[in-house]
Amino acid sequence: MLTALAPPALPGIPRQLPTAPARRQDSSGSSGSYYTAPGSPEPPDVGPDAKGPANWPWVAPGRGAGAQPRLSVSAQNSRQRHGPGSGFPRGPGSGPRPPQPQLRTLPSGEMEVIFGVGPLFGCSGADDREAQQQFTEPAFISPLPPGPASPAAVPRQSQVPDGGSRWATYLELRPRGPSPAAPAQFECVEVALEEGAAPARPRTVPKRQIELRPRPQSPPRAAGAPRPRLLLRTGSLDESLGPLQAAAGFVQTALARKLSPEAPAPSSATFGSTGRSEPETRETARSTHVVLEKAKSRPLRVRDNSAPAKAPRPWPSLRERAIRRDKPAPGTEPLGPVSSSIFLQSEEKIQEARKTRFPREAPDRTVQRARSPPFECRIPSEVPSRAVRPRSPSPPRQTPNGAVRGPRCPSPQNLSPWDRTTRRVSSPLFPEASSEWENQNPAVEETVSRRSPSPPILSQWNQCVAGERSPSLEAPSLWEIPHSAVADAVEPRSSPSPPAFFPWEAPDRPIGTWGPSPQETWDPMGPGSSIAFTQEAQNGLTQEELAPPTPSAPGTPEPTEMQSPSTREISDLAFGGSQQSPEVAAPEPPGSHPVGTLDADKCPEVLGPGEAASGRPRMAIPRPRDVRKLVKTTYAPGFPAGAQGSGLPAPPADPCGEEGGESKTQEPPALGPPAPAHYTSVFIKDFLPVVPHPYEPPEPSFDTVARDASQPNGVLRRRAENSTAKPFKRTEIRLPGALALGRRPEVTSRVRARGPGGENRDVEAQRLVPDGDGRTSPLGGARSSSQRSPVGPAGVRSPRPGSPQMQASPSPGIAPKPKTPPTAPEPAAAVQAPLPREPLALAGRTAPAQPRAASAPPTDRSPQSPSQGARRQPGAAPLGKVLVDPESGRYYFVEAPRQPRLRVLFDPESGQYVEVLLPPSSPGPPHRVYTPLALGLGLYPPAYGPIPSLSLPPSPGPQALGSPQLPWVSEAGPLDGTYYLPVSGTPNPAPPLLLCAPPSSSGPTQPGKGSLFPL
């Protein structure tokens, strides 16, 4: 630091300074340059500059003669080579120079020159001033050598070789130097404008006396300290936001509720023991069972996973997840609307995750208390704990997390997916379940990685998985996957396992019963839509318990069960996980909706072809779809949503179940639905807020999705992919549900082949029962779609919107439970209906109309119509489905199929595929559009009023207002579905109402649905 030590000037010397220069110094001229007045005592030759740098050697020499220190802005602004006759009376003759300016290098590196600052630096006279300056400055300067350390800002002076000096004024001069006592520090700055002309003539700028008020130590200290404070604040905000978001009310409430039961920190210890660094941190927070901890853990998880993706730690927990879902790169997430869904799901999943933890703890306490730490440990030492620990002793627990994992290294696999660290470990542990899990792990691992990249998935999956990643969410997700792989191994245990599943599943659900007893909980859960999902997911359990003979299905259910908790927890993740139990479970969380497809892809691939063998290869396949879906993510939310809420979730489940569900088709769908149930409630609601009711009513979509699940083997997967492109693609996937039905016979056959009809039927029946309860049957997902559609509109549909609540909360779950009895019958009807649908779907598959969602929902409804028709008839609107045209992104409300021939037509104008019902009974031009009035306004929801412009002669088979749904089914034959009136979002008949020749009944419904909702 250049500190100019001014040779102490004699006190008297300053008085020798000419007054004029002093006056000049005193002059208030701001920066105007003026030539020294002729009368100026100092002649042009006189002055420090006249003598050249030698006059001021002490000022600059420190830096080095001719060295020009960096000038502050002020100095640069006022640079001048001071002419020989600079305004400063610096000449030796003029008296001892004003106390030599101190050259000080500011921390910034700028050189500042401090002129003598007199305590009472008045403008009175140069003599007094100079004297004061010198008196003060000797002290001020001498300390300033240390002064450089002092923050006091110093005007900087740099000397150029020619002797010109640049003076910078550092306005903030801290008196904390040696002269803190100075009442006021005045800095005399000579501002010389650089002038190339006649440097000989002294152009001096009046020196301005600047009263330097010591900045309250702001420049160095204030700037330094407050800024870190800001950072700290930011961190605090992040922390607070993270906990707030994660715990936000819902989580806090859930945690608070569960913390009391969970007060015993088996999970805590277990999580602590959890050897996962990432999950461990999360789980440790989680294990603390503190709402904030849980919230933090969740935000931490989000941060851990999404921090790479986004800086804001708080946001990654919720908003970032939502954003990631919206723009999920790797198969993240669903849809922008999912953001709210994410919040709901996050809460739900957090609750579920906590419930899962709690279930683990509570169920462990209740069922497998001893297992609780193991369960928790299972998560940390999932591999050893599950593999080594004979989950058999603690099958329920073991099954939920690693029920079969114990015997099956799947626990590592489980870990591997849900614990990236463990997952990596899982790769070593891989060996046992690794065959499956290798594939699944890679996929899951990759998916998990995706999930990490895509907080949205993390939001879903991590909310569930991260939320439960420590306990069972991820583990369930993965152990769902392993469960699929382990399903066979788990099957036996599944029977024992169900209680644990139910307990933790029940806990998974915010169901009071979860705490009491696994089965008790599981029962309420079974009733609950979520429970139904769990039950259906656990329907495997249910089937395992109920249909233990059909271990294959139970095995499937068990993954489903395991997934079911995971589903609840991960809802979407579990959905994917349960669907693709092994592979998709993990991948799905990244792209839950992709999981729907992935489920279809992976589940069938992993599950269908052979949990391990098929899982591997297909995992590779599903993963592309996963990626696609992840990329398309818009569709996936639909699946999870569908699976969870109603038709939609089930279809993903079915796709997984039917595709992978040859063995576990039906059950994973059950799981799928449970998980999607949350999503559906949230996703579909948020996702399809405009048409949630139309969408939800199209429970057949659920079946369709399930069928799509079936179709995923062939068509459906494509559709899933396509559907993935758009949020409502789901619906279109549902349309392929007709194909799914076609597949469904296959899948059903496969499932039934797997479970000799009895098992399958058990699965189906139980699934359907859970479906009735939660409308979450895997097969029931599709079949139950009918049930769901009927019940769904009444109970499931409401729950479906509240599906997260249903699944998350026992009452919603219980609410569906009452419907379980009807659903139980429904299951048969639904199963039967789905079977007809399957043929219909096959027919529809043959029919071009099949390709799009419209056909699937109609197909679903057609078979469902008998049972659903009755149920749906109460609200004709529910018959319709909201379909999204992936090309145009338009939403079409499509009437439930009256079973006219469904044709999927491509509207080049809108670029949409429109499913048009061509009623076989209507010989008239298939494109006739019938006025909705034919059916009457009563059939349409207010949003779907008849479009007068669309009024056309009713078709020969106009369905009465009362029976438009069923009449269509009867009249239309298997796949003739509702007519699509792609009205381009407007009731105008002008939009190419593609082939709107619906029966008059369909016409009105179509107008209802026909009034396309371009969202």
Swiss-Prot record:
Disulfide bonds: none annotated. Residues 84-94 have a biased composition (Gly residues). Residues 548-557, 691-700, 813-825 have a biased composition (Pro residues). Residues 267-276, 531-542, 861-870 have a biased composition (Polar residues). Residues 277-304, 318-328, 346-367, 759-774 have a biased composition (Basic and acidic residues). It holds the Pfam family DUF4585. Residues 220-233, 380-391, 826-835, 847-858, 993-1004 have a biased composition (Low complexity). Residues 1-111, 139-164, 196-236, 259-460, 488-678, 690-883, 991-1015 are annotated as: Disordered. GO terms for cellular component: nucleoplasm. It comes from the Eukaryota. PANTHER family: CARDIAC-ENRICHED FHL2-INTERACTING PROTEIN-RELATED, PROLINE-RICH BASIC PROTEIN 1. This is Proline-rich basic protein 1.
